[in-house]
């Protein structure tokens, strides 16, 4: 796991709308979802609430690598790539439950463990 750069942390606070969370199946076929129930955990990981994962959950269970893509209000794109951890209890799960709307089930918390961070085509770390 790498440390998220301050530029990305600041951009996260200025993101506009949903993120795109992409995983891959065993054959390498990508699956992308929009996610709005997301958070930045201790400035280390992007957490996505599992409210209605289907293919995404199967991919995570099969060890998929993943990426998160988001844009800021001024239209700047950021992408984080890495491994995915999945939490059904513990501090990451508790963090997700604090902000996930009660109307959604919040079955678990997918946590993207960053290995590379980009702003557009520029590698930040």
Task: Describe the residue ranges of each PLM region.
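Binding-site signature for planar aromatic cofactors or substrates
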Residues: 1-125
């Amino acid at each position: 796991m790498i440390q998220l750069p301050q530029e990305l942390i600041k951009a996260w606070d200025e993101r506009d709308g949903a993120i795109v969370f992409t995983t891959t199946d065993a054959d390498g076929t990508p699956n992308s979802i929009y996610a709005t129930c997301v958070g930045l955990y201790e400035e280390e990981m992007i957490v996505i609430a599992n409210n209605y994962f289907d293919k995404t959950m199967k991919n995570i269970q099969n060890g998929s690598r993943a990426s998160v893509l988001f844009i800021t209000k001024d239209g700047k794109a950021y992408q984080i790539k890495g491994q995915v951890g999945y939490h059904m209890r513990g501090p990451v799960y508790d963090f997700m439950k604090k902000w996930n709307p009660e109307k959604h089930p919040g079955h678990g918390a997918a946590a993207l463990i960053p290995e590379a961070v980009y702003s557009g085509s520029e590698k930040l770390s």
